[in-house]
Swiss-Prot record:
Organism: Porphyra purpurea
Keywords per UniProt: Chlorophyll, Chloroplast, Chromophore, Plastid
Any one GO cellular component localisation term in the record: chloroplast
Entry similarity comment: Belongs to the ELIP/psbS family.
Keyword Magnesium listed: no
Molecular function GO labels: chlorophyll binding
Domain of life: Eukaryota
Protein name (record): Uncharacterized protein Ycf17
Chief location bin: plastid
Amino acid sequence: MKKNFWFWGFTDSAETWNGRFAMIGFMAVIFIELVTGKGLLYLSGLMN
């Protein structure tokens, strides 16, 4: 079985992909906050 092959359900490869996407999303939020100087909740209109 390939490590990066996608299988449906709670498998090791699915959890690996989930972790990768979570890290990308987290870094995107940090980048947006650094560039704009405002938090994500403020930019989305939840903290107005």
